[in-house]
Amino acid sequence: MKQFIIDLFKLEKKPVKGLMAYEWVVMAYLLLTLIVIFLMYTTLNNPQAMIFGRLRIVALTAAMWLVYRIVPCRATRFARVGVQLGLLAWWYPDTFEINRHLPNLDYLFAQWEQDLFGCQPALLFSKALPGSVFSELFDMGYAAYYPMIAATAVYYFGWYYKEFNRATFIILSSFFIYYIVFIFVPVTGPTFYYKAIGLQNVTAGIFPNVHDYFNHHQECLPSPGYTDGIFYHLVESAKAAGERPTAAFPSSHVGVSTICMLLLWHDRNYKFLAALAPLYLLLCCATVYIQAHYLIDAIVGFVSACILFAILLRISRKMITK
């Protein structure tokens, strides 16, 4: 521990002069969405706030770069990563401010779900496992999403530092790739769409096009399950704080958590991988159980994560700290 603390604040002999690779990813996404904002300026509800929000992120990124340049050490490197991971909570609802003005596609995904499986798994899963134990387990898995990401980043920082920048590049890149899809493929997920069309239509297999309904309505169904559970309330509180009718396809919960598991597999830390595996499986199941995603979303989230991981791992093969 003593050596770890010493290494934490030991000045680097050859500090990085410019932005880190993951910060360039953030700036690329910021520029892309800024162009979209200007193109849709007269349509968006509050484009000025979106522009100023991006300027603040640029300023914060520059400030963290300056802190690192003044004190170039592992601690300030970690702080730079922590800031960008923390800002994901701002970027997520921002996707809704753009895609709320695009035609909603839930009616297509719900119909594909019906055609593929002959039912709506998001409607039936919780009914098949209604008990408090199952409810709390799935809600616990869903609530473990961000802690799982943080645990992966902290593990690489503390135990596999030479690939810390590489791992954070892969995690943040995958997030922003999913966010681009969320913007241009406006799917809200069952909890919002079922609420909009009524459960009677869902059970009858009728999935009408709601057009721009979610531009004016953000109501969703309460999560199914044991309503007095601790983890149930954690999930509901998170939904109340920042959930928007956006980001259903593909499931980034499944996608990014899969990438975290693959990162642990890449380092061959099978003990940590085995420890997180139950939470990972519960999380993947929970996306459908709590009606946040269609089953299609979860499947594509898993497949896309494997593809993204392979591509990003290859791209980042030179991002290893000597």
Regions found by a protein language model. Give the residues of each.
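N-terminal transmembrane-helix/juxtamembrane module of multi-pass inner/ER membrane proteins
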Residues: K2-I57, A75-I149
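Hydrophobic alpha-helical transmembrane segments
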Residues: R56-L60, G141-A153, F176, F249-M261
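Interfacial segments of alpha-helical transmembrane regions
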Residues: F78-V83, A150-V185, F192-G205
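Membrane-embedded catalytic cores of phosphoryl/pyrophosphoryl-handling enzymes
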Residues: M20, D228-K322
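Membrane-interfacial catalytic/cofactor-binding modules of polytopic membrane enzymes
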Residues: F184-H266
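Hydrophobic cores of alpha-helical transmembrane segments in multi-pass inner/ER membrane proteins
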Residues: I57-R69, P147-T152, F302-C306, L312
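Aromatic-anchored segments of alpha-helical transmembrane domains
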Residues: L31-L39, L87-P93, F175-I183, Y280-Y289
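Structural signal for the C-terminal ends of transmembrane alpha-helices
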Residues: W65-R74, V154-K162, L264-R268, A310-S316
